[in-house]
């Protein structure tokens, strides 16, 4: 029997870990995933009733979801149609002869939801987060991160070979010949090599403040003289922009490697494969399963999701917020909403008091931190209204499933471009209410807690206040802490990139965050080594979350440190496949679940007194090595 003093996570979760079985179609199981599975089961059962015409809500948007779901579930028609629905689009790209043929249709492809290899988007300006601006990013790589392309990376050749094998099998299902497949994949891999040589690694892209490179539009155009950008932006924006924010500077400095006559054969092959990948979910069952083979292998998942579950997941995509709103109204009581709102307000008050008593910040920086905290916007449970564009997602029952999906994509693309040069919409939710998650948005300075996470084991009106604070309390305070993590600290109360620290305070902050980096850096997870720098912002948020939640718990008359720490250890219960855990160690900004418990709790004196942890015990950490930031 593992003692709490030696391995806190295992003492709580070890027995469960030994017997827990990971479903064959999943990479992991545990707290978050189990809750997500419960919700999926409920939604599957409910939407099955709707398909049968039972208990269908009187709602036009959900009525269109049901129609779309019916199209997705018509497996017989999908099998009969085969690849026919995508053939016109494939032909369109195969008939592009020259780079000029392609560039003449850039805007048309963009607005139609067709591939064009242009990584533009609209998001808040870092320097004035109240307005949306144009950003220029970069395409993603085939391998999980640029670090995988190093000559000495142990998985490089293995994964590239795997990608080629799985892609070959997929393309055969689209009736490409062996010669065509070999040619397409070699060209795609060559373009991918070029991308991997210049795009940011996950570690580099995790430092937000270093991603902001503003360019005057005329200067930006010089990166890619072969692209008719004036015509493109006139078509999608109605005018040319005055500036472009570039987060992937190296990519655009090398733009002629991607957008040129020389690169055209590679780009054309990539576009054809993009059309294939765009269509895989909407055609036959064989194609759907083949298309997921590479990602399943990366995560060690032995089986594809069954077709009924996959159909629900696909159908809900364009209607997620509407389904989330239905779920929240069914499952999230007004009493629970009021209680969580109170908890969030309490947590913000605790944070203010902790900041006011902070002994390593000067009053100047401390006051500015409190200003930021005072205007943080909490969103609890569900959005007050659905996005207006959902009314435009009307199913054409005479069109194919694939064509309906493209039509829905056009609605989203039109909406995305319409935000350019407009004020930021603070009412917009980034995830639906039935998703088991939460987030902080540094550009909007808001925290969001969907209804799905506001239940056991994270939160339950029937469990003790200390258990709730160790669960949802720590999650709430974690998201608040993101306002002051290594990324959030660079943004002011309006979400703008601004240095609001004194030089000495920021130096002290960096010193403390370096200690957090050191605590995690080099830790082992299933044979993979944790990168303390990649995970630092999430680890700082965890640390601040525990500190504030623990203090809030202490204010309750029934406070129990044991129940607090125990539930904190329990919510991170997780069992993952070895391949998946190794992948996470390379690419995830979150530390593995076990380390989020075992590396964090020894920073708190209360942990040592509660569990009588002594020097020589596995969980021991000397007082001078403990770190508290917020």
Go through each PLM region and give its residues.
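Amphipathic alpha-helical core segments of compact helical bundles
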Residues: 316, 320, 324, 477, ...
